[in-house]
A protein has these predicted regions:
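Catalytic-site microenvironment of enzymes
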Residues: 1-153
Length: 153
């Protein structure tokens, strides 16, 4: 990967893909292929991370798979190898989300001294089919003014 710009120098991003490990998210089927939400969210997260790094940002990839990188296949095979920075991912949703927040908070406590801008980006794919059968896309931005940590409430 080649850095093409320093536009994001001094920025640090925590990129988190949805589901993973024991939770594949929703599973769809196209012909003989199963489509698992977590595999596509992970692939998109890696592509985003690469693009941020090319612009000079530091990127921490929170959900990781030791074997799968960016894949150019139309259909991505499922695995349950994903970890949360080396730790097994719990099946329980609240525990899974808290684990991710804990990892980000620990990294942020170290990184905030070295970077002028730190943000977490969560990638989640919702494959629920609706009546109009169109894909929806949402961006949720959380602004923290006084809280020291991200929290699950």
């Amino acid at each position: 990967m080649k850095v093409t710009s320093n536009r994001l120098a001094g920025a640090c991003f925590y990129v988190v893909s949805g589901h993973g490990g024991p939770d594949p998210g929703a599973i769809g089927k196209v012909g003989k292929y199963e489509l698992h939400e977590d595999e596509y969210a992970y692939d998109i997260a890696l592509r985003l991370a690469r693009n941020l790094m090319q612009e000079g940002a530091e990127v921490r990839i929170i959900i990781q798979d030791a074997k799968d990188g960016i894949r150019d296949d139309s259909y991505l095979s499922n695995s349950k190898r994903e970890t949360c920075m080396g730790d097994p991912i719990p099946l329980n949703q609240v525990q899974r989300l808290q684990q991710r927040c804990d990892k980000i908070n620990a990294l942020y406590r170290k990184d905030r001294k070295n970077y002028s801008y730190c943000r977490a980006i969560f990638i989640h794919i919702d494959s629920v089919v609706r009546e109009n059968k169109r894909m929806s896309f949402s961006i949720i931005r959380i602004k923290r003014e006084k809280a020291n940590d991200w929290q699950i409430i």
